[in-house]
Amino acid sequence: MAGDPTAAMEDYKLLQLETATVDAQAPPLPTKTVPVFAPPLSTPPQPNELVYTKRRRTKRKAKCRCLFFTMGMFALGVLMTTAILVSTFILTVPIGALRTAPCPAETFGLGDECVRPVLLNASSNTRNISGVGAVCEEYSEMAASNGTAGLIMSLLDCLNVGDSESVMNKLNLDDTQLAYCNVPSFAECYTKGFGVCYAARPLSPLGELIYKARQALRLDHIIPFPR
């Protein structure tokens, strides 16, 4: 048996078989795994995602257009309402409400008019209405009738009776000839006559603005606005 090659071959095979059996029964040795970070691959969008993105963009554009349209209509409505209110005020405001400026010097206000008492020469022909009109033209004013002038002068006399302060001073007439005639010792006034001139009260700054607006719109022939 010592020199038999067949027996040696069989012993070698048995040794390999035993070694394989031991390796199979032994527990596996732990192995260390090293993580490998790889960038994610870009996947092409699916057809459903493309449709959803297009719909979202369309809705966003529609919302923006709707917002701009709403804001534009709101601004247009505000402008139209303001224009209507301003036009209505310009066309319907009463004239008396715009004549709030104080009367000029040497005059006093009676309602919407500014009244100016004037002295007339009795020797001349200035006591009639035409003569008073000539005097009033110097002030660019109109002459009141004799009855109206008499009532106004009587009113001034009544206001001045029993008052320590001159009515002429209160009415801004203290520097006129009429104020001097209020003194009884001033005999020259007995040869004078009295007349009354009047004019419309001046317009306030708002009245001037509305008057110019009506002139610009050429509405004077439709809605009279005497100065």
From Swiss-Prot:
Its main location: virion. Disulfide bonds: none annotated. Keywords: Glycoprotein, Membrane, Signal-anchor, Transmembrane, Transmembrane helix, Viral envelope protein, Virion. The chain crosses the membrane at residues 66-86. Glycans are attached at N121, N128, N146. Residues 1-65 are intravirion. One of its GO terms (cellular component) is viral envelope. Pfam families: UL45. Residues 87-227 are virion surface. It is found in: Virion membrane. N-glycosylated. It is a single-pass type II membrane protein. Belongs to the herpesviridae HHV-1 UL45 family. This is Envelope protein UL45 homolog.
